[in-house]
């Protein structure tokens, strides 16, 4: 993740005192589909592929699984990349979790991450 994104989230945690960070994917995600197919896309969109590849590799070709795995991976990456986020999570002052929004049902399915010790 780029420093500007992490810094924005750290601000929410350290300054605003937010209690939950939710990394949310969504069903039928075009970026996940494109990464799975290694399709050609305009501009710099393909730069996202490298961040999606760990999830794609573990998805067995299933887009729903890739989307959920990616959301979990990105949430775990947040905790690993930021001492502010990691320390707040360890102190049980912050819950970092992942989920997938289903466009058809308009429901979110959460995918819990273990607490840090």
Task: Give names to the regions the model predicted.
Residues 23:
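Conserved functional hotspot residues or short segments at active or partner-binding sites
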Residues 1-19, 30-117:
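Divalent-metal-activated hydrolytic enzyme cores
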Residues 26-27:
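Active-site cofactor/cluster-binding pocket
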């Amino acid at each position: 993740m780029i420093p500007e994104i992490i810094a924005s989230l750290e601000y929410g945690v350290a300054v605003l005192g937010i209690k939950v960070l939710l990394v949310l994917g969504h069903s039928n995600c075009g970026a996940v589909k494109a990464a799975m197919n290694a399709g050609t896309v305009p501009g710099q969109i393909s730069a996202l592929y490298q961040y999606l590849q760990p999830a794609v590799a573990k998805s067995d070709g299933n887009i729903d699984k890739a989307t959920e795995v990616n959301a979990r991976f990105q949430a775990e990456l947040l905790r690993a990349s930021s001492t502010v986020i990691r320390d707040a999570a360890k102190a049980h002052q912050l819950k970092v979790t992942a989920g997938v929004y289903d466009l058809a049902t308009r429901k979110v399915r959460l995918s819990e991450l273990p607490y840090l010790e």
